Amino acid sequence: MPTSSSFKHRIKEQEDYIRDWTAHREEIARISQDLALIAREINDVAGEIDSVTSSGTAPSTTLVDRVFDESLNFQKIPPLVHSKTPEGNNGRSGDPRPQAAEPPDHLTITRRRTWSRDEVMGDNLLLSSVFQFSKKIRQSIDKTAGKIRILFKDKDRNWDDIESKLRAESEVPIVKTSSMEISSILQELKRVEKQLQAINAMIDPDGTLEALNNMGFPSAMLPSPPKQKSSPVNNHHSPGQTPTLGQPEARALHPAAVSAAAEFENAESEADFSIHFNRVNPDGEEEDVTVHK
């Protein structure tokens, strides 16, 4: 009958509408919970910043470490979708017949939407962490560059001239992007690259160190330690012994060695310069005859 078929078709449309509305309502509830969690997290971080600032410690370190750890530990687990029966008047369902289960396609679409939202949140959190660490790297390289400028201030190499020359040689425009974090990260890394090139030009202007490093001789230019001269005190040791004295010990024993050498010379000057002759008697015994000068 056409009336019954149209009635069934109308009931089916109403069931589909109620099912879609239920899914949308659950999605809105999940989004509200996520927003509440994000707001609570922002309040916690803001409270930590206030406490750290009042204690006199730099808040950037604590905030960056917290954000970086949370971005690495962020788990992208899509929540399960629970089907609910729409309630009508007096807490009864609008249709006495049992509701059909949601089709797999609709469940897959809902989970895919939730998964995409979690991915976006995790990527944004990780991007913010990378931006904070790029600022830390740039601050560290600025300190190193300042030390290099002080170290080579008496040389004929000017840091400002080298830096301006490098900037003019390789000036590449930064790609425009809608993300301020990505643009800032590119600017910080570009600044770090220029600072490293300037440091390399200050330390090795003619490329000698780089050539030695490429040839595999990193210690070819290092001077060899000076050899210590042997003293008369060391000559009295037995042939099997090779005493080694450090430089401070050699300095400490130098006066003693000089005095020992002087005594040795005096002993030689005052030594007995008599000549000993051995003469054999007729009876076969030797006779020691000493002739003094």
Curated annotation (Swiss-Prot):
Pfam families: CEP170_C. It comes from Homo sapiens. Coiled coil: none annotated. Belongs to the CEP170 family. PANTHER family: CENTROSOMAL PROTEIN OF 170 KDA (PTHR15715:SF17). InterPro entries: Cent_Immune-Sig_Mod, CEP170_C. The gene is CEP170P1. Signal peptide: none annotated. Residues 227-245 have a biased composition (Polar residues). This is Cep170-like protein. Residues 78-110, 217-270 are annotated as: Disordered. One of its GO terms (molecular function) is identical protein binding.
